[in-house]
Amino acid sequence: MAHVVVMGAGLGGMPMAYEMKAELTKEDRITVVGNGSTFHFVPSNPWVAVNWRKREDIEFPAAPYLEKKGIAYDPRGVKRVHPERNQLELNDGTTMDYDFLVIATGPKLAFDEVEGLGPHGNTHSVCHVDHAVKAGQAWQGFCQDPG
């Protein structure tokens, strides 16, 4: 019996877990490890940024949908990978063993690479729903007072 862990619960990790579940044996286990309990549908972030959608329209709890297919969900997030031990160190200090690991964590944003870019600069991002909400607030402010 193998334990497959999918690190990341976004647009890569969630479909990967569903597809792997269909291919593995009934004895094999799959666990998805995400940062928090909520799945965000990233392709709709631009709609949040222009206030055509609200955050709650594009997010839902991940665990119930995965569990319905027999996939475990852990919202604690990964702090470190220990490949020599086939083990993850979770953000709360506990560990999780795996036989196979899929890394589907998405991008690491590097706003500091370009001067003036990002939330502390002169631009707005829609890469994460938190960014899209802030961009929507800025857009609303601009619409009310375009200068």
Language model segments and positions:
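Core beta-strand elements of the Rossmann-like FAD/NAD(P) dinucleotide-binding domain
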Residues: 91-100
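Glycine-rich nucleotide phosphate-binding loop and flanking beta-alpha elements
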Residues: 13, 80, 96, 108-109
